[in-house]
Amino acid sequence: MLENPRSPRVRAVAKLTKRSARTETGLFLLEGPQSVREALTYRPEAIVELFATPGGWERHPDIRAKAADADVRVEYVTEDVLHAMADTVTPQGLVSVVRQTPTSVRDIFDAAPRLVAICEEVRDPGNLGTIIRAADAAGADAVVLTGRTVDPYNPKVVRATTGSLFHLPVSVGGELPDVIDRAHAAGLRILAADVKGDDLLAARAEGVLAEPTAWLFGNEARGLEDDALELADRVLRLPIFGRAESLNLATAASVCLYESAFAQRAAPAG
């Protein structure tokens, strides 16, 4: 059992809360039973280390079974050690070190996707995590991150995805013009979400949302820059029926992705 919260090994795990350490090692940190469960289910080969308090391990027999099936060995730690490793105040008894497995932009669009979320300059970890989770729930084929979008392996992003990070391909570090070119070459229409756009309801009525689509979402404060908007085939806005000034980015992105998911599933086949 690991008992010293100041040991070099514990410090190495704790450093993964910092982007520099994640970039250097190609690893990231998972905390809590839900994230660990999804990693064991969908990417067990990416798990490098799994740590648990005895009580945390005992509380989750399904995780114990998945770890055994995947031949992933758990190392017991004290509560003090777990807190020293984790980014959260209450890591719920489980922490894992996992290998990053980003997908290339080329591979994403070579797979002939029908629904993709492109995030340009999205900076808030909670927003990005929620967009990844919403894309997963809506049946999107991938999420592509461009510009200075926050690191998807940031602990706050990882927590906000609640495991969806392991369910669909995520591409990191692409340049927007190249991503748009590849999306067009794959037959996708680029729809940009922006308050300056046309009403989304009109696009729905025209059948636009039933087509293979890459939604483009911008920065929380500034939205999409003019040069990014010019790359889109169409710019759409969500109508506001009540008195709210606007929706936050993650909520708006969720609505847009689900609108496309509904339309694509309602469209006649072939």
Whereabouts are the PLM-identified features?
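N-terminal positively charged helical leader segments and presequences
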Residues: 1-89, 187
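Glycine/charged-rich beta-loop-alpha catalytic/anionic-binding loops adjacent to active sites
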Residues: 19-20, 109-117, 231-240
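Short pre-catalytic strand/loop immediately N-terminal to key active-site residues, enriched for Gly-Thr
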Residues: 26, 119-123, 237-245
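Amphipathic alpha-helical repeat scaffolds
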Residues: 32, 123-131, 247-252
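RNA substrate-binding interface of SAM-dependent RNA methyltransferases
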Residues: 69, 80, 98-197
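Structured adenosyl-cofactor binding patch, chiefly the S-adenosyl-L-methionine
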Residues: 96, 134-138, 152-165, 226-270
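Active-site/ligand-binding-proximal alpha/beta "capping" segment
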Residues: 191-244
